[in-house]
Every structure is written in structure tokens, then in C-alpha cells.
Amino acid sequence: MTLKIGIVGAGGRMGRQLIQAVYHTEGVELGAAFERVGSSLVGTDAGELAGVGKLGIKVSDNLTQEKDNFDLLVDFTRPEGTLQHLAFCVEHHKNIVIGTTGFDDQSKQAIQQAAQNIAIVFASNYSVGVNLVFKLLKKAAKVMGDYCDIEIIEAHHRHKVDAPSGTALSMGEHIAKTLGRDLKTHGVFSREGITGERKPDEIGFSTIRAADVVGEHTVWFADIGERVEISHKASSRMTFANGAVRAAKWLSTKQEGLFDMTDVLDLNNL
């Protein structure tokens, strides 16, 4: 049975890539596409918007009107919008794939609570490569983390609105958890002026915003005399879109629960 996917933020950079990914993936089809109320894109053909040709699906600004046209929602928008879409999914018992970043703790709790009623994949990054890097970081932290300086450097395009990136924070959380540290206590997100010497248990973050960088992350495990770097560079948003569609197909068989790409890719068994 073909899975019908609804995509919110269809006119954005990721939204268009998601439509393309759905179009080129077997076993799924675009059921609905959404934009915010007042958008000039409402009423346009979603396929033409994404460059895959006419699909006969008009961009809508009303999830309720289209609720019978899709089985599952994919959301890469902003936290305030995603929480509204999440409430809709709970009300109408539709699963959701969330790629939005920048949530505060209260919003994350709302997602956890919603997962008692529907199935959710919530990940900071849907790239297969990045999620493999998460696994490698935990292994490196076990071997080197207690005696190395750990620094996370991330770069994204000038339009990204949150910093550090959700992926960088996830990297820090994986490392901190492996080392028995609390990232809220040990994470250092800004250095300026006379900061004093670096504390040995810090996990540092550096952020770059420039031009059209899709996404780059590098983690340093730096010791005196040597440094190990683990890096991932994305050259196209299609890697994230394809991963999100893969997650949607995997999620379609689930009833409730909160999952991430580790579950989708079965990385715990590596």
C-alpha cells in the first residue's frame, strides 16, 4: 500500500527537496503540501513548485481540509509551527517526522508527551552519514574523551536562524552522555575577552554562518602532540530529504513512541 505523505513548509528550501525525494522514492507519494496562511504559494501546484512537473496537488494553508489526503506528516519548519502541526497530528492520530531544530526544553517535553499517542521520529539530522558520525563520536569519546580537549565546529548558510545547529548540539549530547557529563554544565558556547584557561572537561562549540553552506560539522579530540578529527560535510539538502522519507516509510508501521534515526537505521546493533 502506498504511503501518502503530507509536507509542511513546502515552499522552503527543505520543503522543495522533500517533495523531490517523495517523487523519486518507491512506495510513497505526495498526498498534500502546505504553506503558511497568507503565503503567495498557496494554490500553486506542488510538483511544479519543486521542479518535478505537475502533480495535481495544490499547496494548501489548511491541514484540516486536507486531512484525508495524507497518512503521515513531515515537518522541517520552525518550532512554533511544528508544535501546532504536532497538536493536529495528535488530534487526528497521524504520525509525524520532525526535522525542525531550535526547540526549548518545554517544547521537547511536549513532543515526548505527544509520543504517548502517536509515533514520532524526531532527529536533529536525517543524513545517514551524520548518524553514523554520532556512533563514531561515542566510540572516540570512550577512548579519548577523558584526557582530550573536545571542540565542535559547525558551519551553515547565512539563512539558518538557530545556533549552534541542532546537529552540533546532538553531537555534544552524545559525547557528554558517553563521558557522564551534563552538556548544560560543561558546554561552552561563547568565548570572548579574558576567559581564563580552558577547563579540561569543557565541550566547546564554534559557529560559522556564511553564504550557501549546506552543513558542515567537525569534532576535535585534541591531545598534546596529536588531534583526531571526525567530520561530515553535506553538499546537498537531498541527503536530509532522502533520510526523512526513509524515516517516514519506517515510521508508517508504528503506533506510538518517540524514535530517532538511530532507530530507523538500527545503529544500536552495529
UniProtKB/Swiss-Prot annotation:
Function noted in UniProt: Catalyzes the conversion of 4-hydroxy-tetrahydrodipicolinate (HTPA) to tetrahydrodipicolinate.
Biological process according to GO: diaminopimelate biosynthetic process; lysine biosynthetic process via diaminopimelate
Pfam families associated with the record: DapB_C, DapB_N
Amino-acid positions noted as binding (S)-2,3,4,5-tetrahydrodipicolinate in the UniProt annotation, renumbered to this chain: 157, 166-167
UniProt key word NAD: yes
Chain residues that bind NADP(+): 36
MF annotations from Gene Ontology: 4-hydroxy-tetrahydrodipicolinate reductase; NAD binding; NADP binding; oxidoreductase activity, acting on CH or CH2 groups, NAD or NADP as acceptor
UniProt-annotated binding residues for NAD(+): 9-14, 35, 99-101, 123-126
Pathway note: Amino-acid biosynthesis; L-lysine biosynthesis via DAP pathway; (S)-tetrahydrodipicolinate from L-aspartate: step 4/4
Catalysed conversion reaction: (S)-2,3,4,5-tetrahydrodipicolinate + NAD(+) + H2O = (2S,4S)-4-hydroxy-2,3,4,5-tetrahydrodipicolinate + NADH + H(+); (S)-2,3,4,5-tetrahydrodipicolinate + NADP(+) + H2O = (2S,4S)-4-hydroxy-2,3,4,5-tetrahydrodipicolinate + NADPH + H(+)
Active site: 156, 160
Keywords, comma-separated and alphabetical: Amino-acid biosynthesis, Cytoplasm, Diaminopimelate biosynthesis, Lysine biosynthesis, NAD, NADP, Oxidoreductase
EC number(s) reported in the record: 1.17.1.8
The family this protein is said to belong to: Belongs to the DapB family.
Compartment annotation: Cytoplasm
Name of this protein: 4-hydroxy-tetrahydrodipicolinate reductase
Location (main, coarse): cytoplasm
InterPro entries associated with the record: DapB_C, DapB_N, DapB_N_CS, DHDPR_bac, NAD(P)-bd_dom_sf
An annotated GO cellular component: cytosol
Source organism phylogeny: Bacteria, Pseudomonadati, Pseudomonadota, Gammaproteobacteria, Pasteurellales
